[in-house]
Structure formats: structure tokens, C-alpha cells
């Protein structure tokens, strides 16, 4: 589990909009887990890691 989110690693994702996940590794996303990822990011399920001081994450950049 990410300490900043209710997402379980490799689990399904239903994070709230206020979620501050730093490393979302959900296999399915009902919405974006990372604030830096767009909701429709098709690669979110592949393991999104938000970059510090950036509005983009490693999978959707």
C-alpha cells in the first residue's frame, strides 16, 4: 500500500480526486491515481510514478 493512498499494489484503483499517490502501481484505474496523470491515461495501470516538482508522471509524460 502506498502510505499516501488507499491503492493496493497490483490492485484495482478507485482513488479519490484528493489522492496524493507518489507511486501508483494499480493494474486497473477507475480514475487517475496520480495528480500528475490525466484521468484518461492509458498507461496508468503500468505503474505510474510522479516526478517531483513536475506536473507529469513517468508513464504519461
Curated annotation (Swiss-Prot):
Residues 1-29 are annotated as: Beta. One of its GO terms (cellular component) is nucleus. Keywords: Acetylation, Metal-binding, Metal-thiolate cluster, Phosphoprotein. It holds the Pfam family Metallothio. The keyword Acetylation applies. GO terms for biological process: cellular response to cadmium ion; cellular response to copper ion; cellular response to zinc ion; detoxification of copper ion; intracellular zinc ion homeostasis; negative regulation of growth; nitric oxide mediated signal transduction; response to bacterium. The keyword Acetylation applies. A divalent metal cation 4 binds at residues 33-34, 44, 48. A divalent metal cation 3 binds at residues 15, 19, 24, 29. A divalent metal cation 7 binds at residues 50, 57, 59-60. One of its GO terms (molecular function) is zinc ion binding. Residues 30-61 are annotated as: Alpha. It comes from the Eukaryota. A divalent metal cation 6 binds at residues 37, 41, 44, 60. A divalent metal cation 1 binds at residues 5, 7, 21, 24. A divalent metal cation 5 binds at residues 34, 36-37, 50. The modification Phosphoserine is found at residue 58. Belongs to the metallothionein superfamily. Type 1 family. Metallothioneins have a high content of cysteine residues that bind various heavy metals; these proteins are transcriptionally regulated by both heavy metals and glucocorticoids. Class I metallothioneins contain 2 metal-binding domains: four divalent ions are chelated within cluster A of the alpha domain and are coordinated via cysteinyl thiolate bridges to 11 cysteine ligands. Cluster B, the corresponding region within the beta domain, can ligate three divalent ions to 9 cysteines. This is Metallothionein-2. The lineage of its organism: Eukaryota, Metazoa, Chordata, Craniata, Vertebrata. The gene is MT2.
Amino acid at each position: 500500500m502506498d502510505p499516501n493512498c488507499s491503492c493496493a499494489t497490483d490492485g484495482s484503483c478507485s482513488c479519490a480526486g484528493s489522492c496524493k499517490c507518489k507511486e501508483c502501481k494499480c493494474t486497473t484505474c477507475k480514475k487517475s491515481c496520480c495528480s500528475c496523470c490525466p484521468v484518461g491515461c492509458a498507461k496508468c495501470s503500468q505503474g505510474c510514478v510522479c516526478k517531483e516538482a513536475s506536473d507529469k508522471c513517468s508513464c504519461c509524460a
